[in-house]
Design a protein with these regions (language model features):
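A short beta-strand micro-motif common to beta-rich folds, especially ectodomain repeats
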Residues: 113-126
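C-terminal edge beta-strand
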Residues: 24-25, 33-35, 104, 126-139
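C-terminal motif of bacterial Sec signal peptides marking the signal peptidase cleavage site
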Residues: 14-17
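Surface-exposed binding patches on compact interaction domains or structured appendages
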Residues: 51-103
Length: 139
């Protein structure tokens, strides 16, 4: 009987500790330079870039500006980094980025392929996040 009561109390405590108000995901506010993003949904910004490539900057603004970092890079469905370890600079044949404070400078290299390229960047993480989708035209 005591075991059942203890189990019931444990379940109730677990359920009460899960609050959607405490677990609200908040989009990081960004200022952009050199690229025009459109809002896809509350957390996702999307942009089209030319085949020739582009250079642009993102700067975290507002209350959660200090949460700005690139935590995930996916290109055409392939993860490029270890998402568990935010890094301040990264490069590959696709281009590069470098972070300085709350600003991240990106360079997207020319697309030499015959297919469009899809870049997906996760900025921030946890409860403070912004997803970027960049679609690059094909050659």
């Amino acid at each position: 009987m005591i075991r059942r009561f203890t189990l019931l109390v444990s379940i109730v405590i677990c359920l009460m500790s899960c609050s959607t108000e405490d677990e609200k995901i908040t989009p990081i506010e960004l200022s952009t330079e050199g690229i025009d993003f459109r809002v896809e949904d509350m957390l996702t910004l999307t942009a089209n870039v030319p085949q020739e490539g582009i250079e642009f900057s993102l700067t975290g603004i507002g209350v959660y500006a200090d949460k700005v970092c690139v935590s995930d890079i996916t290109i055409d469905g392939h993860i490029q980094n270890d998402p568990s370890m935010p890094i301040i600079s990264f490069c590959g044949d696709w281009g590069s980025y470098e972070q300085n404070g709350n600003t991240i400078d990106f360079t997207i290299a020319p697309n030499q392929g015959d297919k469009i390229r899809l870049f997906e960047f996760t900025i921030g993480g946890g409860y403070w996040v912004r997803f970027l989708k960049i679609i690059q035209a094909k050659e």
